[in-house]
Amino acid sequence: MDVEYCEEYRMNSRGVRLFTCRWLPFSCPKALVFLCHGYGMECGNFMRGVGIKLASHGYGVFGIDYEGHGRSSGARCYIKRFDNIIKDCSEYFKSICAQEEYRGKKRFLYGESMGGAVALLTHKKDPGFWDGAVLVAPMFISLLTRVEDVIPKWKIVPTKDVIDSAFKDPVKREKIRGNKLIYQEKPRLKTALELLRTSMNLEDSLNEVTLPFFVLHGEADTVTDPDVSRALYDRASSKDKTIKLYPGMWHGLTSGEPDDNIEIVFSDILSWLDKRSRRWHRQYQIDPAVYSWHG
């Protein structure tokens, strides 16, 4: 593996111990990519392939397990307030950007499934800060029915049935099912309602998305609707926006498809990032003292 991998625990402003990880090229990174994982998922193992792939192509890649997810502390996959996830991600990501060796580097968000919503809301918190986002099968919904009708069949949680329908390759599927850091039970009602509320609010404000983005979706995805990505592309105010739909591919574009398909997806992602990493040296300045964390 031609990249350096590091893990670290950090304490957030609420006193919660959060797991963070990074994949770095041995040369100076050409840009920074910040990972936002899906509901019930985690960065260190599940998103390892993404981290290695991007870092081996020269990007500094940073991930964080949300409170209650993966190796972070907190009630298991209980999301009391989605805003806490956005706050933790924003504070951690900006603490990295404030470090001397990373100042002036382009900064990109990368979100898969629910992580797509995390990435967009992190952008919304400080629209001028981010240089772009890669959104893989993002989660938010068109809601034309009552809450109690939606929650029982809302396929955002990686339970057994969803794992079966999200990850096409049977070997990769079983490996994911065996990852004990992934939450595979049904969500608490409060968590489901919070996710639904967040999705509804995000859907109502898609026109406020202004950063460059690349949204990718498998046309055969039965976990998150490809029409969600089409709606984002159509309604976002971004001047630089790209959509790619992959015929026959499922939800797990970077982790559950046959290797040849995964290579196609990563080739598209890297091409998009490379083009936008070369454009200019960014001028947005931040105060390192504001975004310091306690290890």
Locate the predicted segments by residue.
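Alpha/beta-hydrolase-fold enzymes
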Residues: 108-191
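The serine-hydrolase catalytic nucleophile loop
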Residues: 39-51
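Conserved alpha/beta-hydrolase
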Residues: 51-74
